[in-house]
């Protein structure tokens, strides 16, 4: 075990949404300098976090499709490291190193912790439960407590700590100078690795049909999710191709660059809409509007069952556009309406969103204080 004055901290990450928060958390622990840090990552988070590996001890967790192998790997990892504190991400869809660590690690009064990046998001694969969930706001805390019966700590959203350093207007200008061409409208299409019957494909087809009926020059920039399979990506491209809609590749752009450059950011219910809202919070001018395609009954039902939510958080009060009927699709391409919605969304975000820059500092102080005092939280 690590010495009390220098606790050994094991942090894990599997999903891209978790990776952003973990990166900031690792940097804050390094700045603090009071811990021995080990980071265990699994694809696709490994790809997202590669730049920080040289700063700390890193373990690349292999893709182990057999559950018993994954559990045995986690147990061996814990036996070798003997961490004082365990902090995991939360996977989904699917499960991985985060869940098996939560399910198999030894527990004390506070550890293990799970970092939540979406309201009420939990994953209890293998019976995984954190002792404490680190959540983004009071709404997330309420949902998580209801689902798990476990304590929560509101720390804000760590992922966005550095967003206030972005010159969003310059990023937008540079992107559009390179990409805009003669387009009247630029739309980012954010892919998701959803296999809920064929409801996701039906949703995309309806959107592609509506696009195909437009007489504007509209550029569609497609950014697949890292966990979308080759077959899923090709299916998406085929859906749009059949409607005569060209998808421009957006995978090689940084996510923030893509979001800043768009007029609309369209997905079924991707957290990229929340990323965009966080960029709007630090932008001096409107950028784009999140658009959620929530009109297909089976997909909407799947969302509610998977998340435990009735609606997409932060999508009311002008913070986003939620399409609840196919008949509403044509209206989102009206240029005057887009300009109006962009301004409304920007103003609403700045009025209603909490400030997120201190989340990692709050989390590290809380975790180390709990370790030092062995304060009983559960």
Place the predicted regions along the sequence by residue:
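A donor-sugar binding/catalytic signature common to diverse glycosyltransferases
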Residues: 97, 131, 145, 250-302
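Short acidic-hydrophobic, aromatic-tinged amphipathic segments that line or gate anion-handling sites
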Residues: 58-63, 246-251, 317-329
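Active-site and donor-binding regions of nucleotide-sugar-utilizing enzymes
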Residues: 10-30, 34-167, 193-195, 227-228, ...
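Structural motif
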Residues: 8, 84-87, 132, 186, ...
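C-terminal amphipathic helix plus adjacent low-complexity
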Residues: 317-378
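Nucleotide-sugar donor-binding patch of glycosyltransferase catalytic domains
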Residues: 278-339
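Conserved catalytic-core segment of nucleotide-activated headgroup transferases in glycan assembly
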Residues: 18-28, 161-238
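Nucleotide-activated donor-binding/catalytic signature segment of Leloir-type glycosyltransferases, i.e.
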Residues: 234-251
């Amino acid at each position: 075990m690590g010495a009390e004055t220098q606790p050994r901290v094991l942090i894990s990450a599997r999903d891209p949404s978790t990776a952003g928060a973990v990166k900031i958390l690792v940097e804050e622990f390094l700045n603090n300098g009071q811990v021995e840090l080990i980071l265990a990552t699994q694809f696709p988070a490994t790809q997202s976090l590669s730049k920080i590996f040289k700063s700390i001890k890193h373990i690349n967790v292999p893709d182990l499709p057999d559950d018993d192998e994954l559990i045995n790997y986690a147990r061996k990892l814990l036996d070798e490291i003997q961490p004082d504190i365990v902090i995991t991400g939360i996977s989904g869809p699917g499960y991985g190193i985060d869940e098996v660590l939560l399910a198999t690690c030894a527990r004390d009064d506070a550890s293990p912790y799970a970092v939540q990046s979406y309201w009420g998001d939990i994953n209890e694969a293998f019976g995984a439960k954190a002792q404490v969930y680190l959540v983004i706001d009071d709404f997330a805390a309420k949902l998580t407590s209801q689902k798990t019966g476990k304590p929560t700590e509101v720390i804000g959203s760590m992922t966005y700590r550095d967003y206030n350093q972005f010159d969003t207007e310059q990023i937008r200008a540079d992107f559009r100078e390179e990409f805009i061409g003669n387009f009247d409208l630029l739309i980012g299409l954010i892919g998701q690795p959803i296999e809920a019957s064929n409801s996701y494909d039906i949703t995309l087809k309806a959107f592609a049909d509506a696009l195909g009926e437009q007489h504007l020059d509209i550029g569609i920039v497609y950014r697949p999710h890292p966990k979308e399979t080759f077959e899923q990506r090709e299916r998406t491209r085929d859906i749009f191709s059949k409607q005569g809609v060209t998808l421009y590749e957006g995978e090689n752009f940084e996510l923030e660059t893509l979001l800043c450059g768009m007029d609309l950011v369209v997905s079924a219910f991707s957290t990229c809409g929340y990323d965009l809202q966080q960029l709007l919070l630090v932008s001096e001018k409107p950028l784009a509007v999140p658009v959620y395609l929530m009109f297909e009954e089976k997909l909407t039902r799947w969302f509610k069952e998977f998340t435990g939510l009735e609606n997409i958080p932060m999508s009311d009060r002008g913070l986003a556009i939620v399409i609840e009927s196919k008949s509403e699709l044509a209206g989102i391409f009206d240029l005057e309406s887009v300009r109006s919605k962009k301004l409304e969304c920007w103003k609403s975000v700045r009025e209603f969103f909490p400030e997120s820059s201190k989340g990692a500092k709050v989390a590290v102080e809380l975790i180390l204080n709990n370790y030092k005092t062995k304060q009983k939280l559960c």
